Structure formats: structure tokens, C-alpha cells
Amino acid sequence: MPNEDVLVGPVNNANQLARVKGFLDRVPAHARVTAGGTAINRPGYFWNPTVVADLKQDDEMIQNEIFAPVITVQKFTDEAEAVRHANGVKYGLASSVWTKDHGRAMRMAKAFDFGCVWINTHIPMVAEMPHGGFKHSGHGKDLSGYGFEEYTRIKHVMTNLNA
């Protein structure tokens, strides 16, 4: 039964909670935490939804997957710069595009080097579609028929039965 006072579930374990805290402890002086930034005082591994703004492209929080309710915000002047920021990381699991301009959303989704791109939403998962990352975010796909194919190796064998 759902707990009505929980809006965001916990991170996976104590080590992950400590890892998230470490990222927030190391926020550079030029950046600012605009929301959250702390663990929730309750049983479990809960972290307050957190927004960190004014980060630079080479900052640790931009260049790593945090796996927590933490979002980083960077300014950009045009689509090309936004795509450079997004793709300028070694990971590529998932991304989101938020805009009222559907054409822009589709251009950016095409340009983003991520295994999953959500438009005007984040984290919906359906079993009919594959899920998996690009670059250092892993290999292969989960869910759907594509996930099954990750456990197979196709081999083509031909023989001459008259020999």
C-alpha cells in the first residue's frame, strides 16, 4: 500500500545515500543549491528533491550519473549549445527535453546521444519499449524483445548435406 506522505522514493542503500551527500558536499563555490540538498530525516535512504544551478560543463555533478532526486541546471543560449552541454558527458542513459515547441523537441531528441529521451516528461517506463544507455551508461537494453536478444547469440551455419 502506498505511503501517502512519500512523493519520491528512497535511493537504493546507505552507500548510495552517502554518495549523493558527497556530491552535495562538493558543490563548487560558483554553483548554488536552489532547492533541497539534504537527506530526509526518516527511516530509510530518503533524499530531498534537489536542484543545483549555475554549474559548469566540467563540474563533477554534470559529468557523473548521480542516481538520486537531484537535477542540475545549466544556462544555454540556443539549441546547439544545449545539445553540446547534454552530449558533453561520458554517460548517456536518459535525458529530457522540456518545451512547447514540438519541432524543437524532435530536433533535440535526434541530436541527443542518450539511450532514452523523454519529451515533456521524465522516467515513464513501458515494457514494450527498450531501456538502456549509450556511452559509459552500459551496454544492451532491458525490457521488450530487445532485452531478450541481449541473452542470445545468432550464428549462421550452412552445410552441404550431399558431401
Feature locations, PLM:
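Short secondary-structure junctions
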Residues: 29-38
